Amino acid sequence: MALERSDVEKIAHLARLGLDDAEIPRTTQTLNDILGLIDRMQAVDTHGIEPLAHPLEATQRLRPDEVTETDHRDAYQAIAPAVENGLYLVPKVIE
């Protein structure tokens, strides 16, 4: 499927792109080249090929998800000027 000038003008309008008359032929050719590449990619027989999430078969060694620190909330809030229900109270700065 090849795009024509009217197609590119409509696409540019819908995408809110300001294309000059001089830019339309170059843009038309670029979009047609992209569509041609997509057609060639779709023509490749990929039956029986599993999709890859990543081209390398590398995996990350992850550490176990364990709690390594204790809760210091009470100690931190003990030195705060104002705390209520576990929340820090601050002066109102926006009316």
UniProtKB/Swiss-Prot annotation:
Family matches, as Gene3D superfamilies: Glu-tRNAGln amidotransferase C subunit, N-terminal domain
Assigned EC number: 6.3.5.-
Pfam families according to UniProt: GatC
Coiled coil regions, renumbered to chain: none
Family: Belongs to the GatC family.
Cited NCBIfam families: gatC (TIGR00135)
PANTHER family, alphabetized: GLUTAMYL-TRNA(GLN) AMIDOTRANSFERASE SUBUNIT C, MITOCHONDRIAL
Protein's UniProt name: Aspartyl/glutamyl-tRNA(Asn/Gln) amidotransferase subunit C
